[in-house]
Amino acid sequence: MDRIVSLYWDNVDRRIVEAQRRVFAHFGLAIDQRERTGLRHCDFLDSYMAEVAEDDVALLVDIDCFPLNRAIVDRAFAAARAGRIFGCAQSRNNIDPERLYVAPMFMAISRRTWDRLGRPSFCPDAGNDVAQALHDRAVAAGVEVEMLYPEACVAPKWRLGDFAVFGIGTFYVGGVFHLFQSRRKAYEFILLEVAEATIAGRPIDVLGLIDRALPLRLRDHWVSQFRDWRKAMGLSRVLRRLRRGTPPAPAGARQRAKTEAQ
């Protein structure tokens, strides 16, 4: 059986959940959207893969990710049934951008392949992001991996090796869209508009989305700069006190002094 599943918490905007469901339904596909608030994504994926039947193929999808056509889903399932791992390429953001892997934002894998690899956990560790160790084990075992690479992005944030950049509102070759960082409410309009265009069968106005996102990106930049400045100023005050031989007062003492002054 071909299965499609996504996980979400109760803090995800229900419009995002509904948009994903509607896109899959538009292509004649049912997606099992499971609310498991508080459960780590990797733990959910581990338990889900153990749950599916031996002959099943799973398409693991982030709640803010969906296909832009039916063909890419059929291609993903066909690859997984043939024993391959298929999905969107990602890197560990700014930590290790040269080390690419198929991420479970859009990953097709069969239960047989997962069993063959020894049922590796999807959970991250000090050296790996979610599913990164699974990807490396597959490569070492000779399992063929097919990766889709970004072709456009509304708000670039990270480098993907020497191939491309990705970030908020990324479009992948073949027809996959992933919002990324869906917790950032200001950018939800990107996903909602891409979903509506996909369902309506009209071209996606990527340039228009970029224009609308630009002021948000500039604001994010200056907010980040201000936070860095505040942190630097706080450190400077501590260093000045240490140079004068006056240790910084504990937070509680500062609060008491402030109260007494009032």
Where are these regions (language model features)?
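C-terminal catalytic/acceptor-binding lobe
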Residues: 135-262
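Conserved catalytic core of nucleotide-sugar-dependent glycosyltransferases
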Residues: 66-137
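N-terminal anchoring/stem segment of glycosyltransferases
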Residues: 1-55
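Short, high-confidence coil segments that cap the C-terminus of an alpha-helix
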Residues: 55, 82-85, 143
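Short, surface-exposed basic-aromatic patches at helix termini and helix-loop junctions that form
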Residues: 22-25, 50-51, 74-81, 140
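Short, solvent-exposed loop/turn segments at secondary-structure junctions
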Residues: 10-12, 38-39, 64-67, 91-93, ...
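Residue-level recognition of beta-strand->loop/alpha-helix junctions
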Residues: 33-35, 89, 149
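Short beta-strand-to-loop acidic/aromatic patch adjacent to the donor-nucleotide binding site
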Residues: 55-66
